[in-house]
A protein has these predicted regions:
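Low-complexity, highly charged intrinsically disordered N-terminal segments
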Residues: 18-133, 184-189, 195-289, 293, ...
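Walker A/P-loop
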Residues: 136-154
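Conserved C-terminal RecA-like helicase domain
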Residues: 196-232, 285-286, 290-300, 306-311, ...
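C-terminal catalytic or substrate-handling cores of phosphate/nucleotide-
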Residues: 258, 270-274, 417-447, 463-466, ...
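C-terminal accessory/interaction regions of large nucleic acid-associated machines
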Residues: 591-612, 730, 739-966
Length: 966
């Protein structure tokens, strides 16, 4: 955002509020509002000028920003309470102070503030009302995006939780001191209102920060809260902190700690002593009446129990220390709520949902809720930076990348992929020298746009070795000092020509393109003359720092009111949570094959208001392609969250999956996904069926009515010689049917194969002429008669084997009769060649001769008799020889015979007279889709959770016929 004087702030605030009530948000409307607001501000702030054009651009951008409603997946174990209690909490000091702070100090507009309010409301309503008595233990997860404002979100959640009555808040803030201290500073600003290093002098004006500086007399006295940690680099909960005199029975307490064995153990010891003071003398007795809220920032890092293995006996050796200590702290409280925050939930979804231990309790799987918080439209995420290709099979459209990537291919000598700690980079590659020039240009251009007090950062991430980082810092600093000297004193130096060429041939062109793509009115067009005039001042503000465990350098942005401009050389400390404010140029060569680690290293994601066109990412083409793949996998996983929410499934019941990389990248570390398995998703030569149905009679009546209307729309039917009715249908007809069956409530959420992939698979075959024609068959049963398309047809009986109050389930998750799958093959003549082909495939599948299928004598005669008859008749004949298992045994091979242009849908009309909840429904329709085998379809590999595997039973055909009641 541009630097604003008091008159401009007042004018922008007035115009922004006025715009909320306007239906029209055209540029003309916005300009009129700003001009009127400028006149008003001139009377209240005499002597200060208002830049109307700048405010019009600022407000125009804000008006075009939108934020999606968060996607919430819940087990509904917690009764909604927050929206009923919220109006009764007066005056909500913590939240109202924090909202005002975001508005005045962080310059969030009303729309953004409302989004934070709505998101935090959704989350707080999923944890328990702290006034609820008795034992309760809530486990949830909030999924955001890298650098999208997760900290602001959970500070908002904490503020509302404190207003609601939570007594103890513990924030687990990463694994590094710097990140813990940075998080503590955010808590100081948003919750405490004073520098926690000076708690005893918190009322001194010079120690008050953030919300503590606000003047809000309507709230009365500031809310009271005691921090047991502070913002100094060593302000963690140490062994000495165990002796603190803060009483658990007093006001609320907050701690911000590293995810490290020592501070976590210190908390456990302190709680043991403090609970004894409250009268909980018995060892292990939970603390009651003091509800705990634990926020786990970067919950996929260090919190996961990486020693948990399937089929391994539970003992002290298969739980990691940090995971154990977190769970033990939660166990100390009779009432607790745990919320894990992460932008890369790839590891969290593979936590064993059934893990439970006597001392530590249940693992950290988010069994109660998952909230997927989508960032606002102005967020620059992986899809915008790297893009990805269209994938028809899963229904995801292509995302075009912004033109900010610059390829690096000259780094091998200076920064080889593999190197030792004594490696000497020597001279900087030309690509890094160019990146330094790009950063100086970006800093100067932001000054031209009025962002003179803005922070500016450049990331140099080329090695994880500390000793090499120190050398890199030195040569980067030498190069930057050379550039700065030239800017000041050598106007005819070639560097000036390089700067001018970089601006005119790169920045000017790409800025125009980005301005068009983003429709950002604040990305004003700049000339070389304007930018070059600011180069010297911009360069003077830049410093080079190394950020790692052995360096004393810090990124103390909050201590630089005039703005900090820094080139940060580092690795691990810059890869997790630590924010690089105003990051515009990144030079990144560090490789990792893990999705989550790679994505967290991408510090260039986030909000780049007013300077997105100045951003550059220098990296290799291979890394760009890796990021693109992970961006797609992330988008697909978040689509899964949306499907889960639509189906009203609980996190514990809905299996999740993540797309695997074809060339060896890992979803996450192997020890974090011990409970995951690889699976292929493809419908070629497969049977897909529905076997779980809602017991809601109204839903099933609507679906039955739809099916009747749908088959009637297909035109005239013909009666099938095998019994039942038959139609032909087009691809479009079939897609309409599937869309209806995917509607919430129609099909059990475990029927995940009826998701978008099924529809997209059918659509994708269009390019190859596949699945253009469909045979629709409604088989006749042996039960009561119902009218369908004005024809009396006997219904099919399938017993209910479920005790679930909501869903009717079929035995073996199977509705289809194997003999019915050949009903559309009666026009194909069985030849010796076809039969030999089928039997050969069967032999290969079974790993030996198909002895059970054909034996000498009577069975051989039966096979010979099949020649010249239709494939359908032949299968029935073979089935008669072997019993009803005949069709089932060879149906995989039979699908090889179906033309790729033709699919089969069997619609079973189920008699539910004896099914609880559905007794009076005339019938419940169930589908079975049989797909021809084709080599033209793409196979997708996923890493899947155990719950996903359980939920896919109905994807796999069983040899047995379905259970029937005659």
């Amino acid at each position: 955002m541009i630097d604003l004087n008091e008159a401009e702030k007042e004018a922008l605030d007035f115009a922004s509020r006025a715009l909320q009530s306007k239906n029209s948000r055209t540029p003309e409307t916005i300009r009129k509002l700003v001009e009127a607001a400028a006149i008003m501000a001139a009377t209240t702030q005499p002597g200060l000028q208002v830049d109307v054009d700048a405010l019009v651009a600022e407000l125009g951008h804000a008006a075009s920003v939108w934020t999606e409603t968060p996607v919430v997946l819940s087990n509904f174990r917690v009764k909604p309470w927050w929206f009923e209690k919220k109006p009764l909490i007066e005056p909500m000091r913590f939240w109202r102070r924090y909202r005002r702070y975001l508005e005045q100090e962080k310059n969030l507009r009303d729309r953004d503030l409302d989004a934070v309010d709505e998101q935090t409301d959704s989350i707080i309503d999923r944890i328990q009302d702290p006034a609820t008595t008795g034992p309760w233990d809530i486990r949830g997860m909030v999924v955001g995006s890298v650098q999208s404002g997760k900290t602001a979100n959970y500070v908002g959640v904490i503020s509302k939780a404190l207003d609601a009555g939570y007594k103890i808040v513990i924030v687990l803030a990463g694994i590094h001191k710097n990140l813990r201290a940075q998080t503590q500073e955010r808590i100081d600003e948003g919750i405490l209102g004073f520098d926690s290093q000076h708690r005893m002098d918190q009322n001194r004006e010079d120690y008050r920060i953030g919300v503590g500086k606000l003047v809000m007399p309507e709230l009365g006295l500031p809310p009271s809260i005691t921090p047991l940690t502070n913002s100094s680099i060593n302000g963690d909960f140490t062994a000495g902190a165990q002796t603190v005199t803060a009483s658990l029975s007093g006001g609320p307490i907050i701690l911000v700690v590293k995810k490290n064995k020592s501070p976590l153990k210190n908390i456990s010891k302190w709680l043991e002593v403090a609970s004894g003071q409250l009268g909980h003398q018995a060892s292990g007795t939970p603390i009651s009446g003091l509800p705990l809220l634990m926020i786990d920032d970067e919950a996929d890092n260090a919190s996961i129990n990486t020693k948990d293995r399937p089929n391994v006996e539970d003992d002290e050796t298969n739980i990691t220390t940090i995971n154990k200590e977190i769970r033990r702290i939660l166990q100390r409280f009779e009432q607790s709520a745990y919320i894990g925050y992460t932008a890369t939930p790839f590891a969290n979804i593979f936590i064993n949902p059934e893990a439970d231990r006597d001392e530590e309790g249940k693992d950290l799987f988010p069994r109660d809720f998952i909230v997927n918080v989508r960032p606002s439209s102005r967020y620059v995420g992986p899809a915008k930076v790297f893009g990805y290709s269209r994938d028809l099979l899963v229904g995801i459209e292509a995302a075009a990348p912004l033109p900010i990537f610059r390829p690096v291919n000259d780094h091998e000598l200076a920064f080889p992929l593999k190197h030792k700690g004594d490696h000497d980079p020597g001279e900087l590659p030309a690509s890094l020298k160019e990146a330094i020039l790009a950063f100086v240009l970006a800093c100067a251009a932001r000054r031209v746009r009025g962002q003179k007090k803005a922070h500016n950062s450049m990331l140099v991430h080329v090695t994880w070795r500390t000793a090499v980082q120190q050398k890199v810092r030195k040569i980067v600093e030498d190069e930057f000092h050379r550039v700065r000297r030239v800017i000041h004193y050598e106007k005819n130096h070639p560097v000036w020509e390089q700067l001018k060429a970089l601006w005119e041939e790169d920045y000017s062109r790409s800025s125009t393109k980005i301005r068009e793509l983003e429709n950002d009115t604040r990305l004003s067009e700049l000339t070389w003359e304007q930018v070059s005039a600011e180069l010297a001042v911009a360069a003077d503000k830049i410093s080079v720092r190394e950020i790692h465990s052995e360096s004393t350098d810090e990124l103390a942005y909050n201590r630089e009111p005039e703005g900090l401009s820094v080139i940060a050389v580092g690795a691990n400390k810059l890869s997790r949570g630590l924010t690089l404010e105003g990051l515009s140029v990144s030079y990144f060569l560090r490789t990792t094959r893990m999705y989550d680690t790679l994505m967290q290293m991408g510090r260039w994601f986030g909000y780049r208001d007013g300077y997105l066109d100045l951003c550059r990412l220098y990296t290799t083409e291979e890394l760009r392609d890796w990021f693109s793949h992970v961006a797609f996998a992330e988008e697909e996983l978040k689509r899964e969250f949306e499907l889960m929410a639509d189906s009203r499934m609980t996190p514990a019941d809905y299996g999740l999956r993540v797309r695997e990389h074809p060339d060896g990248m890992l979803v996450t570390a192997l020890n974090k996904m011990a409970h995951g398995e690889s699976r292929e998703v493809n419908f070629s030569g497969r049977l897909v069926q529905t076997a779980f149905f809602s017991r809601d009679a109204q839903v099933q009546t609507k679906r039955a009515d739809f099916v009747e209307r749908w088959v009637s729309s297909l035109g005239c039917f013909r009666t099938d010689k095998w019994g039942g009715l038959r139609w032909t249908a087009t691809r479009g007809d079939v897609l309409a049917l599937l869309d209806a069956f995917r509607a919430p409530g129609f099909t059990h959420p475990k029927c995940t194969h009826f998701g978008p992939e099924l529809r997209s698979f059918i659509e994708a075959q269009q390019e190859n002429g596949g699945l253009a024609e469909w045979t629709i068959v409604i088989p006749s049963g042996s039960r009561k008669v119902a009218q369908i398309a004005d024809y009396p047809l006997k219904l099919v009986k399938r017993p209910d084997v479920s005790a679930d109050q909501k869903y009717y389930s079929l035995s073996k998750a199977n509705v289809q009769d194997p003999a019915h799958e050949i009903l559309d093959l009666d026009e194909i003549e069985l030849t010796e060649e076809i039969l030999d082909d089928v039997l050969t495939k069967l032999e290969l599948r079974l790993g030996g001769p198909p002895v059970p299928l054909i034996r000498p004598g009577e069975q051989q005669d039966a096979v010979t008799a099949c020649i010249g008859r239709s494939v359908a008749e032949a299968v029935v004949a073979l089935g008669e020889v072997r019993g009803r298992r005949g069709a089932s045994a060879i149906r995989d091979e039979i699908r090889q015979l179906r033309p790729v242009s033709r699919g089969l849908i069997l619609i079973y009309l189920l008699d539910t007279t004896d099914v609880e909840g559905l007794n009076d429904v005339r019938f419940v329709p169930a589908l079975a889709l049989s797909f021809p085998a084709t080599n033209m379809s793409k196979r997708l590999k996923y890493k899947v959770t155990p719950t996903w595997i359980k939920g896919q039973l109905q994807n796999y055909e069983l040899e047995e016929s379905p259970d029937e009641e005659d």
